[in-house]
Amino acid sequence: MLIIPAIDLKDGQCVRLKQGIMEDATVFSETPETVALHWLDNGARQLHLVDLNGAFAGKPKNGEAIRAIVEAIDGRIPIQLGGGIRDLETVEYYLDNGISYVIIGTAAVKIPGFLHDACYAFPGQIMVGLDAKGGKVAVDGWSKVTGHDVIDLAKKFQDYGVEAIIHTDIGRDGMLNGLNIEATVELAQALTIPVIASGGVTNLDDIRKLCQVQSEGITGVITGRAIYQGSLDFKEAQALADQLDSAK
């Protein structure tokens, strides 16, 4: 089980939002590359970047900060990136410039054929971010909830050849009130590709609970506010996950 630190970028800074609301941002650092190196030094094996401005604008907006992070990490661990990726040119640009996995969210739902084409052009490098509220998929930086069922859509995307599904429970993201483990397990059970959990990780107890169900196909968990505010110690979390892995 991978514990994956999140670096959310807004106006070139590392921030955390509550429930995806741009106006409710806490700035944690003005130099995101320093944050990336901090997690690398603490044993992170993958990083999760989000271009928040990009997610709302529908096109890349934090290019400078992303470049700085890629240069600082220098290929030592994989970087996954989402936010504002709505065309193949952007996918190709990021994958050619040090990003290991591109995460497609809104565009997977709203632009017919785009996800399918991306998976075909860049096999093994496309993940889908499914943001859920009450089992329905939300789009446009979480500002709109659609009628699409999360599991139905995930199955369809699995057939396209996506590498993994990142499942975020919007109601819990940035709120530090525990993961929606039931919904994540339900999704993982319906799929054969890996599911990465996200939204609401609070403490080691959440990591322990998630590790107990990882055999359902949950391969990682993305954490943000908890590791920045200190309710979860990143090193301890990864050590616990490794310990529970080896005990199996």
From Swiss-Prot:
GO terms for molecular function: 1-(5-phosphoribosyl)-5-[(5-phosphoribosylamino)methylideneamino]imidazole-4-carboxamide isomerase activity. Transmembrane segments: none annotated. InterPro entries: Aldolase_TIM, His_biosynth, HisA_bact_arch, Isoase_HisA-like, Isoase_HisA-like_bact, RibuloseP-bd_barrel. It is found in: Cytoplasm. It catalyses: 1-(5-phospho-beta-D-ribosyl)-5-[(5-phospho-beta-D-ribosylamino)methylideneamino]imidazole-4-carboxamide = 5-[(5-phospho-1-deoxy-D-ribulos-1-ylimino)methylamino]-1-(5-phospho-beta-D-ribosyl)imidazole-4-carboxamide. It comes from the Bacteria. Pfam families: His_biosynth (PF00977). One of its GO terms (cellular component) is cytoplasm. Its EC number is 5.3.1.16. Pathway: Amino-acid biosynthesis; L-histidine biosynthesis; L-histidine from 5-phospho-alpha-D-ribose 1-diphosphate: step 4/9. The lineage of its organism: Bacteria, Pseudomonadati, Pseudomonadota, Betaproteobacteria, Nitrosomonadales. The active site is at residues 8, 131. The gene is hisA. Keywords: Amino-acid biosynthesis, Cytoplasm, Histidine biosynthesis, Isomerase. Its main location: cytoplasm. GO terms for biological process: L-histidine biosynthetic process; L-tryptophan biosynthetic process. This is 1-(5-phosphoribosyl)-5-[(5-phosphoribosylamino)methylideneamino] imidazole-4-carboxamide isomerase. Belongs to the HisA/HisF family. The keyword Cytoplasm applies.
